[in-house]
Regions:
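Surface-exposed, interaction-prone regions used to assemble/regulate multi-protein complexes
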Residues: 1-135
Length: 135
């Protein structure tokens, strides 16, 4: 899987997934860092999967891209939001399961020290909200 950072505006930090909320308004993923809180809102999501990093060692430790390897080398300090640059096992699985209706969806990933969140969506995030914490 080839991935790259999706949004370079997200400040470097040590992030954890605080919540994933899905309702009729879409999907809201909240990341909590030492200095920042980031909210990523998707409108329509075809599939979302939150997995403990210990169950995703192939992705977590065997990063095949420079950006992921650098992020991992810094002990997951940085920008945790990535996008796949080609079809992945996740999007191919979704395409098969949907009988082709989910063709062309993007695969977005949030990779933190403890979680990997896979998001399949035909549309990029509607908004990314960055709140600087008061020290």
């Amino acid at each position: 899987m080839e991935i790259k950072n999706y949004n370079n505006d997200i400040p470097d930090d040590y992030y954890e997934v605080m919540s994933i909320l899905q309702d009729r308004n879409g999907t809201l993923i909240t990341l909590d860092g030492i200095n920042n809180e980031v909210k990523i809102r998707f409108g329509a999501v075809d599939s979302i999967c939150d997995t403990d990093e210990g169950s995703r060692m192939e992705t977590y430790l065997n990063g095949k891209t420079k950006e992921l390897n650098e992020y991992r080398a810094k002990k997951f300090y940085g920008n945790p939001f990535f996008v796949a640059t080609a079809e992945t096992d996740f999007t191919l699985w979704l395409k098969k399961e949907s009988w082709g209706f989910s063709e062309g969806v993007g695969h977005y990933l949030i990779i933190t020290l403890n979680d990997i969140v896979d998001i399949a969506s035909a549309f990029p995030p509607q908004e990314i909200i960055i709140n600087k914490k008061k020290q």
